[in-house]
Amino acid sequence: MTNEINHANPAALHSVPYHVGIIMDGNGRWAQARGRPRLAGHQAGVDNIRRILEASVRYGIKVLTIYAFSTENWQRPMDEVMGLMQLLSLTIKRQLNELHKNGVQIRHSGRMAGINPDLQAQIRHALEVTQHNDRIILNVAFNYGGRAEILDAVRQVIADGIPPDSLTEELFSRYLYTCDLPDADLIIRTGGEWRLSNFLIWQAAYAEYYTTPTYWPDFDEEELYKALLEYNARERRFGRVLQQT
Ligand code: FPP
């Protein structure tokens, strides 16, 4: 029984990552494997966010950043792009109250420009309503690109007239969309690829990386537990040498 996963016992984990980023890949393949349209996979993907959010609260994760729509995703077929926009809109309509009641603080990382003004208003409303919640932060990376984020930050640093000598990593971090959030500790990618795909490229500089072939809609609490176990087995050195005994 020693190898049995005991996901009912979060205490078995000696360290829990504070900030987890998830690249939710494999929705399309999940749908294709069932002979269903890609959007059915994205809908199943949305349903799974709820499940993993609840599990994250149980494990003590404090910030969950999910990659929901990248700046590159605009190049997908128009019906898929519109479908993803609609899904976010419907999800906010249907789930905001419940998320708020459960103490979830919603954040947005990404460019507002380019998003339909009605959806922008819905996003702003969700951020405002939940801003004082503190059970977990659900940071939705939507119309997000890591390079665009760095570029936007550089532009603002220049616009603010920050003298080059006083610009530190810490100050620069505050200009990113993630602003006061700490760096990511663990990046999980579902769907089997080994790529960061322009996700949290500044914030994940020292994150541990975990990938699984499981498609996002099938990534359940047990899969999350496996990722956390793997994280526990890693030795985080942040570029240093561990002290010799
Ligand atoms: C990748 O699957 C996933 C995405 C493009 C984004 C993930 C989106 C969701 C979970 C739904 C939208 C979320 C919100 C909050 C509205 P893929 O299509 O690349 O899958 P594939 O690699 O199998 O084709």
Residue ranges and their predicted role:
Residues 1-245:
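Flexible, compositionally biased loop and terminal segments
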